[in-house]
Amino acid sequence: MPLISAPRSSAPDRPCRAIVFAHFDPHGGFDPHVTEALLRYRPHADRLVVVSTSASRLPAALRGIVDTFVPRANVGYDFGSWQAGLATLCRADFDEILCVNDSVYGPLFDLGPALRDPRTAGADLWGMVLSEQSTRRRGGRCPHVQSWFFGMRRRLLASPVYETFWNAIVPVLDKEEVVDRYELGLSVACREAGLRIAGIYDARTAGPMRLGDLWPHLSLAEPRRSWRLWKKGRRTPHNPSELAWLRLLEAGVPFVKVGLLRVNHYGLDLNRVTAALGRLHPDALPLIRGHLARCG
């Protein structure tokens, strides 16, 4: 385990911030889109920690970029990796700690405005997306900060909630239990302790998907996909990170979920999605296509 080390000197116009990046690659390497993401995170971090469950060492391109590298066994999903990365930090040194992963492409554009966004300025736990989800154990809709990008600020870092939650992380094999216990659980614990949660894109106030959102993706030439989109796309709650991807970009969220392009749960027209990304963020498209070609 790397030694706990002090942060680099923070820029005077921003909070002292650490970023813990959870990495996994099926082939054990660092994809170019991940390298690019870390390069874009670096200016916003006083300490940049990478925890990998697939690589034993950093590539040369990242050795001067990453402050701390933690290789670990592939157990415990991303929360296990964040737990290991957080253990290398003295949280009292930081105004904010971000936990992020490689399940998204991006930042596609400057992350700075999102980090200063007034919609999340007063939150103790915040993220790019706040959505609602139900699970077998919790039943009804549970508002929570989606875990692919979340930030913990001073009040949470100093709260008993922080230590109680992160000390309780243990490897869990069932993905739904991970979501229930940890992704939803962190937001629930914060709310119960009187801490505030927020998201740049808040699905509770964004409203359901409109016909105009779905219509461009419907096609008589692809009836099965179109029917899947029509049926699933109008349900609430939905996962905005994979369905409302364009709304997120327009709201200032500089990321697109990998799962949107690999799995396409809702049945969007991926040709339209990639064409739009090519228009909006042409520099990112070769990285996205390269990753999809390599990993499927």
PLM regions and their residue ranges:
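ER/Golgi luminal nucleotide-sugar-dependent glycosyltransferases, focusing on the catalytic module
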Residues: M1-G296
